[in-house]
């Protein structure tokens, strides 16, 4: 704002939400302050372009170069009406939750799911999505205080979710990492399903429905 840009602050929301909202709301770019799956002191910045895609490495390098130069040389700053405006919009998280729910055509009615939010960005959105799809949701690690993100919880510390699933006789456990751009699953026996196994399950379902192009999955 100090150099003329207008900013909409969405609050604490998942990284994928920013990627979606940038395009859906017609923003020019998105920025996320995130420690991802790391402890809270390790924050970095992720940028998205106006289409919701990560910036190419060469563009990020240019941004870093610009920031370093700006630190050494005072920028010309606007005054008066030229200064950007700040808007706080707490509804953006709900818009993202609504979008996710409506991309899923399967009801979770009758399922008991333990959700581990890693005390992170999806601590509110995750339960909202799952309960909105009809599941009975048992929440753990959904009380972020700014310091406890990823601390012995979430997808990097799956043991607590394994125990909780069996304690509650749940059908499934879902664990996000701190910024909720990845997840692991735990089955009803407490066994962990990693990313490769999750992709396999999704691929088999898509193949069954005739939606898996060339019967091929590409992962990175």
Where are these regions (language model features)?
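N-terminal small/polar loop signature for handling phosphorylated ligands or for N-terminal nucleophile
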Residues: 1-42, 128-186
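Solvent-exposed amphipathic alpha-helical surface segments
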Residues: 3, 70, 74, 209-210
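Alpha-helix capping and helix-loop boundary segments enriched in small/acidic/polar residues
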Residues: 9, 117, 148-153, 190-194, ...
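Structural motif
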Residues: 10-12, 33-34, 58, 116, ...
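Short alpha-helical
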Residues: 16, 121, 201
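Conserved beta-strand elements of the Class I
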Residues: 29, 112-114, 218
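Gly/Ser/Thr-enriched, mixed-charge loops and adjacent short helices
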Residues: 43-168
């Amino acid at each position: 704002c100090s150099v003329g840009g207008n900013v909409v602050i969405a609050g604490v929301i998942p990284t994928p939400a920013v990627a979606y909202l940038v395009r859906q709301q017609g923003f020019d770019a998105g920025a996320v302050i995130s420690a991802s799956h790391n402890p809270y002191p390790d924050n970095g910045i992720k940028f998205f372009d106006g289409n919701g895609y990560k910036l190419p490495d060469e563009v990020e390098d240019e941004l870093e170069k610009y920031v370093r130069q700006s630190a050494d040389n005072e920028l010309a700053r606007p005054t008066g009406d030229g200064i950007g405006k700040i808007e706080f919009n707490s509804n953006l998280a709900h818009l993202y939750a609504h979008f996710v729910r409506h991309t899923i055509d399967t009801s979770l009615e009758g399922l008991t799911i333990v959700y581990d939010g890693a005390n992170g960005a999806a601590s509110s959105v995750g339960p909202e999505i799952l309960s909105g799809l009809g599941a009975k949701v048992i929440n753990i690690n959904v009380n972020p205080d700014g310091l406890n993100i990823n601390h012995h919880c979430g997808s990097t510390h799956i043991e607590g979710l394994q125990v909780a699933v069996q304690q509650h006789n749940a059908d499934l456990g879902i664990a996000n990492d701190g910024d909720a751009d990845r997840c692991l699953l735990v089955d009803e026996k407490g066994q962990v399903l990693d990313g490769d196994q999750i992709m396999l399950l999704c691929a088999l379902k898509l193949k069954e429905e005739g939606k898996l192009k060339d019967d091929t999955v590409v992962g990175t």
